[in-house]
Amino acid sequence: MAEDIGALVEAVRAHPGVRAKAEIGLVREVFGESDWLAGPGDDGAVVMHEGMALVVGGEAILPAFVAADPYGAGVAAVTTNLNDLAAMGAWPLALVDTVTGPRAVVRPVLEGMRWAAGLYDVPVVGGHLTGTTGAPSLSAFGLGRADRPLSARAAAPGQSLVVAACLDGQMRADFPFFPSFDERGGRLAGDVRLLAEGASAGWVVAAKD
């Protein structure tokens, strides 16, 4: 069993998605050490305002994905932000986006965002758009409210570990993404709010997307 666990640990450490997280260390090099409430944050940053914990976060979508599937990239911009807010124990409030590129790319990006935002019942309230003939780019940013913010840094030995993931769906052939919209559909709006409910009730104390 110990050998199996050791092999699993090494496989996880070698995964490209995990190795890419090491680049986050650059933020600490530039901005210095800070607690997770003040930022740089965890999956999001917690901003205290008049006694309310607001959670903000952002995601830049892989440029190759934006160019290859702009509609899917728009959907991903919504999903990734809501997943980050959920991991912070936040109820999603709103999204904004920044999009650049030719109209033929920008339009399906926005259509994908509109569809996904409707599916999750979270409004896209604004952003920035620049029409250009250059390479397209897409980033989006989420705002949420947390009764009891969560952080990966609150994890400790002896806690019960639960993997909260959707198993309904199929892996894409072209990019390492696992959409479940067709299979899960209308239940996703509730799914993305489960951790906020758990955090508010006090039975979730740490999380990581």
Region roles according to the model:
Residues M1-D209:
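Helix-biased detector of long, well-ordered alpha-helical tracts
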